[in-house]
């Protein structure tokens, strides 16, 4: 079945190497006059000139293989006789006539027209008839049919050429698609009749630089010297020994554990090793025991190990009181202390000497250049001598590093610290046998200093600053700290037998400083005045649960009229946010 082609004349194609061109017309016949192309269908490029007569292919010498084969069949005759060729227009130049002639010649080569018909057509007289639209349509139709016949004839020629090729070439090689009608323009895959296969060669270019001979360092012993491999290193040989390791033991014979009757003499070296060193702790004259290490004498090359512990350094940290220092001075002076205590006359003389010393001009203990401004009699405060007071020692300024109070003026910060409240709590943790005890430090809020603390009906808002771990050191037998109160031209003193050491609550071992466990803050703490004040420690007071209360506590505090100290009574109120068990904690400072 013939494929449809668009109605335009075929372009001139160069002769292919595989296809056979038709033989040219005999030179004896005069060349026919080709009809001129229509003026309304110009080509985009000028047609090539007609080839000279000597450029046609000769079938005989160039294609000898076709001499022995059968000639291809002639093309079928046209269906209708061609119309009369009209005369060219008058305005057509000689060049246009030559172009038309060349196109007609190229078409004759492809279609192989009959020379007799061309000869007959050349003798026809030229007519001046103009081609109509109907005639032009019929002519186009005939040209299209002629092109189809030429294409069919060309396909037959190709098939006949393939059938005449040797079997070896047809079986091994498939027809390339480039030789079909749908030809792909590819310069690298042009069809050729060359049968041999070409091998692609890409030879390296000559070296641009001069060659160099380099020596390779080789270890001559690497093939002869024996080395242990990693597998041999990982191998663990099995050692089979006797079950008793060469030492026979009889568990039923207990006589082997008895000491020998005659002791064998030891060598001096072994006897020195078995000797125990007797560490003697000398007792000094002042009664302090000092442990001396055996490395202090004779072994200076050893490094002395220093142990940091509160037990070993406790005696060194304890300072002598005034009474002990006085006794030590008397011992050095050769005075018998027992004789002075039992001698009544000596006591009376010392008392009178103390009164005489008070009348003399006082001298400062450290700076002798200071002069006294006012001298007051110092007497015991008998009205409150039965009360107990405690001195609190902080490890640092309580609110100096606080976020809110640290930025205040030092005078305002001191005013807040003077009205601070300490409240003790006991927290029941995971270990019920050893509950955790701490003191809460609270100061009035920033705008609560103007309120009257003596008014019991007025509530004062306090801020919870931090918690402290506390430790009480009683010293009732020999108090070295006294509380002095100045009132009405006299100075009254009271002993402070209790010392309260406060340390900031820090993170436990294994926790960072940001993971300090904060305890719930009570919403209210009531402070009331009492006639007598004492220090009482309640182990089960202020037990907290895991719930958290308010962030600030409102309290009331009363100050004593005598100015000796401040006493507070803390009673938790029965509300939803209070978690104390109702016991009271009374403090005085």
Swiss-Prot record:
Per the UniProt entry, the signal peptide is none
Location of region: Disordered: 1-180, 542-589
Instruction: Mark out the compositionally biased spans (Pro residues).
Output: 1-54, 71-87
Provide the Gene Ontology terms for cellular component: Cdc73/Paf1 complex; nucleus
Protein function:
Component of the PAF1 complex (PAF1C) which is involved in histone modifications such as methylation on histone H3 'Lys-4' (H3K4me3). Involved in regulation of flowering time. Required for the expression of the flowering repressors and MAD-box genes FLC, AGL27/FLM and AGL31/MAF2. Required for histone H3 trimethylation on 'Lys-4' H3K4me3 at the FLC and AGL27/FLM loci. Involved in the control of seed dormancy and germination.
Output one GO BP term. Answer: flower development
**Ranges of compositional bias, category Low complexity:** 55-65
The gene behind this protein is VIP2
* Bilayer-crossing regions: none
Q: Where is the composition biased (Basic residues)?
A: 117-127
Q: Which UniProt keywords apply?
A: Coiled coil, Flowering, Nucleus, Transcription, Transcription regulation
Q: Per its UniProt record, what PANTHER family does this chain match?
A: RNA POLYMERASE II-ASSOCIATED FACTOR 1 HOMOLOG
Q: What residue ranges carry the coiled-coil annotation?
A: 126-159
Task: List the cysteine pairs that form cystine.
Answer: none
The record describes its quaternary structure and partners as:
Component of the nuclear PAF1 complex (PAF1C), which consists of VIP2/ELF7/PAF1, VIP3/SKI8/WDR61, VIP4/LEO1, VIP5/RTF1, VIP6/ELF8/CTR9 and CDC73.
Q: What happens when the gene is disrupted?
A: Early flowering, reduced plant size and defects in floral morphology in whorls 1-3, but fully fertile flowers. Reduced seed dormancy and increased germination rate of freshly harvested seeds.
Question: Which family, according to UniProt?
Answer: Belongs to the PAF1 family.
Q: Where is the composition biased (Basic and acidic residues)?
A: 88-116, 128-154
Name assigned to this protein: Protein PAF1 homolog
Which organs or tissues contain this protein? Expressed in roots, leaves and shoot apex.
Q: Where in the cell is it found?
A: Nucleus
Q: Does the keyword Iron apply?
A: no
Looking up Pfam families in the UniProt record yields:
Paf1
């Amino acid at each position: 079945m013939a494929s449809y082609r668009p109605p335009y004349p075929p372009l001139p194609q160069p002769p292919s190497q595989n296809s056979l061109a038709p033989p040219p017309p005999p030179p004896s016949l005069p060349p026919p006059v080709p009809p001129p192309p229509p003026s309304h269908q110009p080509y985009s490029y000028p047609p090539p000139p007609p080839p000279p007569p000597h450029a046609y292919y000769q079938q005989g010498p160039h294609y000898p293989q076709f001499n022995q084969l059968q000639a291809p069949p002639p093309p079928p005759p046209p269906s209708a006789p061609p119309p009369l060729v009209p005369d060219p227009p008058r305005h057509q130049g000689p060049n246009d006539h030559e172009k038309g002639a060349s196109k007609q010649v190229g078409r004759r080569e492809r279609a192989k027209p009959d020379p007799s018909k061309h000869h007959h057509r050349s003798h026809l007289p030229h007519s001046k008839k103009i081609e109509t639209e109907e005639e032009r349509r019929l002519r186009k139709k005939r040209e299209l049919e002629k092109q189809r016949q030429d294409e069919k004839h060309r396909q037959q020629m190709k098939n006949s050429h393939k059938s005449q090729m040797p079997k070896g070439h047809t079986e091994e090689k498939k027809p390339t698609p480039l030789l079909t009608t749908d030809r792909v323009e590819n310069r690298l895959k042009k069809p050729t009749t060359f049968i041999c296969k070409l091998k692609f060669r890409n030879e390296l270019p000559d070296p641009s630089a001069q060659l160099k001979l380099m020596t390779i360092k080789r270890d001559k012993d690497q093939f002869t010297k024996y080395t242990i491999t990693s597998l041999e290193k990982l191998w663990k040989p099995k050692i089979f020994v006797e079950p008793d390791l060469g030492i026979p033991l009889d568990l039923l014979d207990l006589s082997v554990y008895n000491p020998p009757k005659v002791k064998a003499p030891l060598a001096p070296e072994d006897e020195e090793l078995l000797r125990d060193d007797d560490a003697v702790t000398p007792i000094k004259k002042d009664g302090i025991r000092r442990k001396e290490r055996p490395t202090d004498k004779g072994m200076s090359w050893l490094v002395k190990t220093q142990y940091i512990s509160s037990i070993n350094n406790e005696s060194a940290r304890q300072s002598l009181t005034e009474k002990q220092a006085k006794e030590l001075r008397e011992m050095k002076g050769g005075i018998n202390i027992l004789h002075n205590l039992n001698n009544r006359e000596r006591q009376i003389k010392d008392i009178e000497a103390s009164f005489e010393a008070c009348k003399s001009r006082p001298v400062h203990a450290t700076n002798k250049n200071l002069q006294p401004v006012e001298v007051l009699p110092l007497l015991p405060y008998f009205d409150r001598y039965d009360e107990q007071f405690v001195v609190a020692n902080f490890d640092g300024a309580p609110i100096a590093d606080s976020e809110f109070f640290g930025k205040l003026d030092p005078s305002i910060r001191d005013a807040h610290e003077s009205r601070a409240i300490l409240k003790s709590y006991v927290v029941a943790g995971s270990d019920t046998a050893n509950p955790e005890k701490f003191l809460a430090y609270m100061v009035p809020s920033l705008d609560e200093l103007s309120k009257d603390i003596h008014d019991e009906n007025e509530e004062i808002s306090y801020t919870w600053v931090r918690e402290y771990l506390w430790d009480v050191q009683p010293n009732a037998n020999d108090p070295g700290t006294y509380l002095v109160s100045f009132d009405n031209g006299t100075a009254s003193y009271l002993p402070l037998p209790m010392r309260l050491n406060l340390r900031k609550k820090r993170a436990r071992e294994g926790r960072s400083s940001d993971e300090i466990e904060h305890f719930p803050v009570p919403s209210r703490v009531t402070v009331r005045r009492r006639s007598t004040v004492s220090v009482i420690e309640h182990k089960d007071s202020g037990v907290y649960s895991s719930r958290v209360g308010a962030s600030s506590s409102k309290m009331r505090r009363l100050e004593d009229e005598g100015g000796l100290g401040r006493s507070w009574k803390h009673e938790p109120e029965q509300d939803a946010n209070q978690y104390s068990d109702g016991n009271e904690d009374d403090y005085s400072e």
